[in-house]
Amino acid sequence: TVTMGLPKHGLLTASGIECVGSLKVVDLGISPAFLEHIECPLELIVAEEVGALFGRRPRNAHKGSFGHVLIIGGSAGRSGAIVMAAQAALRSGVGLVSVVTPRSVWSNVAASMKEAMVFAGEETTSGVLTPDFWPAGVKDLKAFDAVLVGPGMGTQDECRLVVMDIIRRCKVPLVLDADALNVHKRRDRLIPTATCAVIMTPHPGELARFMAEDVAGIQSDRLDACRRAVEATKATVVLKGAGTIVAASGEKPVVNMTGNPGMAKGGSGDVLAGIIVGLLGQGLAPFAASRAGVYIQGRAGDRAALRLSQAGMLARDIIDDIPFVMRELCGR
């Protein structure tokens, strides 16, 4: 597919992607000075920009040098989500990961992650965390550099109370993923009241529910939907899908073109949320962590597809390729 002068954002997201093969931009001789004065609605995330976000890791570093993140979620029958989120956070380079999950799945989660600290939270009879689930070791959220809540959590009323409590208490960057978004009522006004930076990572269906719209409306203009979600919540919004868009107040929205249809499987969103919280834990700002996270996840997914095929790859295969992407981006 040939486009003239500059990429067009309609070719990079939603149904436009289906009409594009290998995209080639043809130079028409437009002056760079002229292009500098063009106001583009969307920027493309590129490898050089992402790599520049990561500094040298000091030789005298210790595990605390690279941050400590807390991940809350999991439930009976859905413990794999929090395992993948935690593993992705660790592979992103964060120094420490603590996990809280219901007591009934604690042993399975702990056995799946030798490098994470796993705490058992009190649970309801349906196997989800209770509002007063807090284990002694994680009650002080200020002890962490970032928090992720939602993977595999469930959508029962108790889960909503858990999410509300965390939003009210959290003072460090907070990622709301999956069920931490699904428990909100239409156009919930709690998120804008948060005293911490909030990152939301919805797929189109989750954003449609949150915004009280239909999925077709979200997908018809993903950029506008993202902007409206930012305006409604004051959060950084990561609208997942083909041509993932990241938007935040005061920032120009960006679109990501790494990734492939093989990533359209259960668990891929948990991997992305884990990468983003891991990058937040290492000190990246919310918008930077979000745009770097979607690029890294997509590029790792592309590597996994080359190894295994799009049809045969799984979400956990994306995690296996994160270290190689980090080495390519950072040179070490």
Functional labels for PLM-detected ranges:
Residues 6, 11-174, 178, 182-199, ...:
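Small-residue (G/A/S/T)-rich helix-start motifs and N-terminal tracts that mark the onset
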